[in-house]
């Protein structure tokens, strides 16, 4: 029986040198935020471990997650799809169709029982027996449950699979339901966003492929490596928030100076994602940098939380945790107090010096 190829076997067959492979591991480890030692571990894993089979299924969705995924720059999606993993099924991009495509699902399920990753883009509608989404002549929810039975783990791509997204907006006539409410007995990695950042998606796949385990997840099931901080925490406009400098109207002086967009509805203070660090389009920019506030697309229920331009209320603390209307006055008061304190200390020092000279 032939041994399955590893990632290293594939790239060597493609003519890629050992030096280029090592460089790839170093760059990928750095892009994932790992230390220098991780590059060696990554190289060893990719040299010895078989490529992980991946089944990519689509429910109710717009395919924006796939559109984002194919634009990954670090690592390049071609390296992920053609070398790092074995993408055995994806009905959006595969050449096979009809019964031929369906037979691939059954073959992979049987051959790689307990070893394949089930990546799900979109969600199943449960109303009317799941008849609002038909795949291969069957309700998508049935197909999802069938493939989940023998999966090693499930990746829920995007806000649709993670939370429900716009198709679950009230009154949700199709009863569109997130994956974790349907599959209850498998580990599920939620990678929310509408869509998720490309490098976040490939980063999750790279981590599983390299280390043979799931990344550490937060209490909502999201990878901590990408969803542990609020966008607001690392936003380059954060100093303007702390200084009480806000855009009050589109195209006002504050907007032209790049002031904080909080009053224009920016959801950065309550949204956990890597937009302000990883950014989009190969690290070029992200919505706030382009002049538009965050809409909170990686948070549960963002589609039913009112207008994207409705301002968040009762944001507490200096920085994020104080009311924005009072931040400017507070900052001015703190600065004024500091100046007064400095003047008082200086006066005391001068008086003490004069007394010491007089006593001498």
UniProtKB/Swiss-Prot annotation:
Residues 1-46 form the signal peptide. One of its GO terms (cellular component) is [Ni-Fe] hydrogenase complex. Its EC number is 1.12.99.6. The keyword Plastid does not apply. It is found in: Cell membrane. The keyword Iron applies. [4Fe-4S] cluster 2 binds at residues 232, 235, 260, 266. [3Fe-4S] cluster binds at residues 275, 294, 297. This is Uptake hydrogenase small subunit. The lineage of its organism: Bacteria, Pseudomonadati, Pseudomonadota, Alphaproteobacteria, Hyphomicrobiales. The gene is hupA.
